[in-house]
Amino acid sequence: MTEFKQRQTVGNASESVLEFDGQQYLDGRASDPREFGWMRGAPPPPDKRVTFENETVWTFPQLRWSLSHMRELRPTVQVWRGRGGPSQLECSNRSTEIDGLTFVDMDDRTNRFEEALFDTYTDGILVLHRGRIIYERYFGALAPHVQHSCQSITKSYAGTLAAALVHEGILDDRKTISQFVPELRGTGWEDATLRQVMDMQTNVAFTEDYTSVDKSYRCEYLRTIRKEGAHGKFVYKGVDTNVMAWVMSRATGRSFAQLLQERLWLPLGCEEDAYVEIDPGNGMPRAHSGLNVTLRDLARFGELMRCEGSCNGKQ
């Protein structure tokens, strides 16, 4: 259980820390990436560099900078918003009311909503109510025009695209994966149906491991994964999403980024471009975790879900 300790001294400054599992971490205010000056300078001094080479991208507190700067760290491809104006998000500001809300946390302490945002290292938050923005705040490295890593929310975008292609008859979810992608014959997906992949009901020899190097989006790696047993039981795994994206691209002749652009970014009237992290070797997307998007454009996608696929008067 997390324990919050007030005004402990960290380094030469008096700052607040959070304690978790016996370790202390700078809190949301003290870990603000703007205060650390990550990647500033020409070139940045060694102790301010955030790179995969020095293994600081996923290290706290550098992580609070890297999640809003992934295209400076990895190869990416653009998701273009088009030349038209963005769709309007009406505002009905209730920030003062929401910031003042209080609740009792797991440690029986009364806490204000605004303080909880700092305690949970929030980079940005936007609340839509019936299509109107009632609350919007940004912290640290994030700003309204800056894209933030979506991580596994990317899977929701990929699944939405796949469901639309099935609905339109472009994809037949009863077919096996090897019928779409012959390169996956002899793998764990050879006899899995597209529907089983879409529902993460494959039984392949893969375990989600967030402590090792992620290879789950690489075609060469996917071809090494074998079957462990009968398909049909749900097990969460990102490799299924990457196989699904491979199927979509093979069937449509469009990349994952192009499908996002044509079927979501343009129709939704998104405000900013997005970008997708890709395999530097062959350009294949990290469809399980590689989308980076602004908070308002993420809200537009959420509103599309709330309205059951209806947007700007179109289904």
Predicted regions: what they are:
Residues 117-120, 124, 149-152, 233-237, ...:
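Aromatic-acidic/polar surface patches that form glycan- and anion
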Residues 149, 167-202, 252-289, 293:
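Active-site helix/loop module of the DD-peptidase/beta-lactamase fold
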Residues 223-228, 233-234, 258, 273-315:
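Penicillin-binding protein/beta-lactamase superfamily catalytic region
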Residues 131-134, 151-170, 197, 234-265, ...:
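Alpha-helical scaffold elements that line and support the substrate/ligand-binding pocket
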Residues 104-105, 109-117, 132, 143-150, ...:
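Active-site-proximal loop and beta-strand segments within enzyme catalytic domains
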Residues 1-142, 168-171:
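N-terminal leader/targeting segments and the immediately adjacent pre-domain N-terminus
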Residues 202-278:
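A small/polar active-site loop signature that marks catalytic segments
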Residues 110, 190-191, 215, 240-241, ...:
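A structural signal for well-ordered alpha-helical scaffolds and beta->alpha junctions
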